[in-house]
Amino acid sequence: MKFLSSFLLVCVLCGTASAYFVEHHIDYQKDINILRNLDISSNYIKDLNFVKTKISESKTYKKHLLKAINEQYDNIVILQNILKEQNVPTEILYLAVIESGLKNNSKSRMGAVGIWQLMPRTAKAMGLRVDSKVDERLDPLKSTKAAAKYLSELKEQFGKWYLALIAYNCGDGALRRAIARAGSDDIKDLLDPNKKFVGLETRNFLRKIIITAQIANDLNQIMGSDPRLFNNPNDINIAKINVKDAFKNSAIQKIKSAKK
């Protein structure tokens, strides 16, 4: 009876998932490409816990994404191109969407600041100035380069981008312990809600990044046919403007469109 109940649950979820993808015109291949860009097996798209989260939370994630787009539209392409220049998958941008809504002045009670919610110690280790006079975590260009550097170092340590994202959230030490307990670095093992190798916040964090990236990739659903946004940014030119000291932490750039 228990086996039958489990089997029926799987069937219901699979049927619901199929209906969801059809209803929302989701392109499986685009979704799979996002997984691959983050070093995740394409089979993860069928993971039951992932599918349940996508079905139940997509509307909320979409609303959060649209709010960030509406408020920070011009910055999205700039940030994605910085990630691209640093050889970091542009899907990583959705980490910042989740952490701060792309708000430059975002601050947490724990002391994390800026678009990427960097802690002081991490920011300083990545070369940013953080003191009583200047906090370069508030500089969107410098902080994005610092976050890209940090994520690249985590990727070098653990070998996969999704592991770098997990470590970004819970810390590299916690991830090492989780991998040791799980005996594997496979995403399904690490995010298993029954085994709890990583905390609930971290499990939700990674799934939310993936799902938000997948929502954003459906351009027709979000922003029509604008080719500049999300996971396919065009090249643009960015030039800094020298300003007075009082505005050092301001996000002031001259942007030249690359449209042809």
Model regions: which residues?
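Positively charged n-region of N-terminal signal peptides that target proteins for export
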Residues: 1-5
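Bacterial N-terminal signal peptides
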Residues: 6-15
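An acidic, Gly/Ser/Thr/Pro-rich helix-cap/linker signature
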Residues: 15-87, 256-259
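Solvent-exposed, acidic/flexible segments
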Residues: 62-76, 85-88, 108-116, 136-144, ...
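Short, functionally critical alpha-helical segments immediately adjacent to catalytic or ligand/cofactor-binding
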Residues: 88-105, 164-169
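Substrate-binding/active-site groove segments that recognize
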Residues: 110-132, 140, 144-147, 151, ...
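Catalytic and binding regions of secreted/periplasmic enzymes and modules that target cell-wall glycans
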Residues: 151-182
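Low-complexity, Gly/Ser/Thr/Pro-rich intrinsically disordered linker/tail segments
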Residues: 221-260
